[in-house]
Swiss-Prot record:
UniProt protein name: WD repeat-containing protein 70
One Pfam family here: WD40
WD repeat intervals: 148-187, 195-236, 249-289, 298-337, 344-383, 387-434, 437-476
Keyword Transit peptide attributed: no
Compositional bias segments (type: Acidic residues): 120-132, 604-614
Record's keyword terms, sorted: Repeat, WD repeat
Biased composition (Low complexity): 67-84
Residue ranges with Gly residues bias: 539-549
PROSITE patterns assigned to the protein according to its UniProt record, in alphabetical order: WD_REPEATS_1, WD_REPEATS_2, WD_REPEATS_REGION
Family in the record: Belongs to the WD repeat GAD-1 family.
Lineage of producing organism: Eukaryota, Metazoa, Chordata, Craniata, Vertebrata
Comp. bias (Basic and acidic residues): 36-55, 508-533
Organism annotation: Xenopus laevis
């Protein structure tokens, strides 16, 4: 009925029909044909593989020839079988690619795969290969250079969020860098000298990022806020007390310091006075705890570096006698672990750091070595790398965020070679990568886990930041995309003003004044009138000595040395009272008035002649 209506409508409108009729397909027949073709091709593939195995067993030395002959035979057999099948059934679809026919030994069911298709198993294998290669995780494709100064950058610190970088050096300066606020000019937004003329040894942000620990060459560590303003300063101990446990603070130069990873108010410092002390930000008057490293003989040794474990339970210190000593944070008397011969005695161990896992300890020694230790088996090192020159007492080493790599820098003499940043595999301890940084020593290195960027401090005053645009986050990527701000040009005058020379004050001639007024003015001037200086009343001043007696001390000095000698005749002074004593006796005369009324005086005899029998040494010398 519908067909008749369509034909009548088409005839009325003047054309033969509304279009071609839709073709119909027999899906079952097509599926059966495809299945048959797939089975036949699978058989051909199996036959070709069996022939290849037979040929390879006969001639095992030649590996390339059987595969090519096998492919030729496969093609030939495929063409012959295809010619035989073409007489019976028609092949539907394109032939399978050679990689599919040669790789899959199972029965192929379904239509052929495209030539560029890769199985999911192959993709997983490639991903595993990429994961096994740690070199690809090193973010060093791009770099920026921050000019700190001209002297060694001896301290680096990056806050936990990665927004601000702080650098310190041998020039006593501490510079603050804000990645979000910097442009392509890469200028620091603040520079200061918190410890005056002392070299900066260490800088570190707290785990909250609100304060910075500054350790310099003096004996008092400082804590600054994010903008560089002082928060607290540790007290200095009494250097005349022998027992360092009884002093309230350090008495000698500091060597290092760091924050507690869990407690935001606690930090630690080590010093040349032979102690490691813990402090609380809220109490600057006295240290919180003290640890005293000892040598084999029980004598105090100097700790050159110190650090906390990742969980904050242990405190580790590298000492000048080559030992590494680890204490439990709650027990300061005896060490928990120690290794006496970790490094060469007499050298400064420049860095001690824990891995993110917490069981592996890495040490950078002054004996040009880098070692890793398992604190559970602390007698012998896990791995040792030697020949890494170290000229600085703060040369760093640090772990990558995934604990697969260990990085450190090398020192070079001026003008001889380039300083390098070396990457070691933690397991095999093979050097797998290196970066030539600059023509100076590499002192500090820092790999931030959130930014995935590497910061390096060098011996020529540079701080370099290495990053990868694809793998790194924020940090240096924020400032390199900003254009450098143009300097503001001085505003020019839109209209030129003509100024007469004599209108300016410097060209004006002074007006003539009367002589009388000038004389009166000179008379009031004590210098021009030669006025004599008035006498000084009271104590002296201005280099002039005051009058005597102005003060109590001067009055005493004036009167204490007076000449009090009596020039009067003593005999006349006594005889003045003779008449009164004779008429009114009071002391001696009444006692002798009855027994001896008349006074009897001693008779004056002439000098007796000296006997001649006396020895010469007894005779009086006249």
């Amino acid at each position: 009925m519908d067909e008749n209506e369509d034909s009548s409508i088409a005839a009325t409108m003047g054309f033969s029909g509304f279009g071609k009729k839709a073709r119909t397909f027999d899906l079952e027949a097509m599926f059966e044909q495809t299945r048959r073709t797939a089975v036949e091709r699978s058989k051909q593939t199996l036959e070709a593989r069996e022939k290849e195995e037979q040929l390879s067993n006969k001639s095992p030395v030649i590996k390339g020839a059987p595969s090519s002959s096998g492919q030729k035979k496969t093609k030939a057999s495929g063409s012959s079988s295809g010619s035989e099948d073409s007489s019976d059934d028609e092949l539907i679809g394109p032939p399978l690619p050679p990689n599919v026919t040669g790789d899959h030994g199972d029965e192929l069911i379904g239509p052929p795969l495209p030539p560029g298709y890769k199985d999911s198993d192959d993709e997983d294998d490639e991903e595993h290969e990429d994961d096994d290669n740690p070199v690809k995780d090193i973010p060093d494709s791009h770099e920026i250079t921050l000019q700190h100064g001209t002297k060694t950058v001896s301290a680096l610190g990056l806050d936990p969020s990665g927004a601000r970088l702080v650098t310190g050096g041998y020039d006593y300066d501490v510079r603050f860098w804000d990645f979000a606020g910097m442009d392509a000019s890469l200028q620091a937004f603040r520079s200061l000298q918190p410890c005056e003329c002392h070299q900066i040894k260490s800088l570190q942000y707290s785990n909250t990022g609100d304060v910075i620990l500054v350790v310099a060459g003096n004996s008092q560590a400082k804590v600054l806020d994010r903008d560089g303003f002082p928060v607290m300063e540790c007290v200095k101990g009494d250097q005349y007390i022998v027992d360092m446990a009884n002093t309230k603070g350090h008495t000698a130069m500091l060597n290092g310091g760091c924050w507690h990873p869990k407690i935001k108010e606690e930090f630690m410092t080590c010093s040349n006075d032979g102690t490691v002390r813990t402090w609380d930000v809220s109490n600057e008057k006295k240290h919180k705890g003290i640890f005293k490293p000892r040598s084999v003989q029980g004598k105090p040794v100097i700790p050159t570096c110190c650090t906390y474990s990742r969980d904050g339970k242990f405190i580790a210190a590298g000492c000048q006698d080559g030992s590494i000593q680890i204490w439990d944070r709650n027990m300061s008397v005896h060490t928990k672990f120690h290794c006496r011969q970790a490094h060469t005695p007499g050298t400064d161990t420049s860095c001690v750091t824990f891995s993110y896992g917490g069981n592996v300890l890495a040490t950078r020694g002054g004996d040009d070595t880098l070692k890793t230790w398992d604190i559970r088996k602390f007698k012998n090192p896990l791995n040792v790398a030697s020949g890494l020159e170290n000229f600085f007492p703060m040369t760093d080493c640090c772990f990558s965020p995934d604990d697969k790599l260990l990085i450190t820098g090398t020192s070079v003499k001026r003008g001889i070679g380039d300083g390098k940043l070396l990457f070691f595999d933690v397991v095999t301890f093979q050097k797998i990568y290196e970066i030539q940084v600059t023509e100076a020593s590499v002192v500090r290195c820092l790999w931030h886990p959130k930014l995935n960027q590497i910061m390096v401090g060098t011996g020529n005053g540079l701080a370099k930041v290495y990053y990868d645009p694809n793998r790194s986050q924020r940090g240096a990527k924020l400032c390199v995309v900003k254009t450098q701000r143009k300097e503001r040009q001085a505003e020019t005058l839109t209209q030129d003003y003509i100024i007469t020379p004599h209108a300016l004050p410097m060209f004006r001639e002074p007006r003539q004044r009367s002589t009388r007024k000038q004389l009166e003015k000179d008379r009031l001037d004590p210098v021009k009138s030669h006025k004599p200086e008035p006498p000084v009343a009271g104590p002296g001043r201005g280099g002039r000595v005051g009058t005597h007696g102005g003060t109590l001390s001067s009055f005493i000095v004036k009167n204490i040395a007076l000449d009090k000698t009596d020039d009067s005749n003593a005999r006349e002074a006594i005889l003045r009272h003779a008449k009164d004593a004779e008429q009114n006796p009071y002391w001696v005369a009444p006692a002798y008035s009855k027994t001896q009324p008349n006074t009897v005086f001693a008779e004056v005899d002439s000098d007796e002649e000296e006997p001649d029998n006396e020895p010469e040494w007894k005779k009086r010398k006249i």
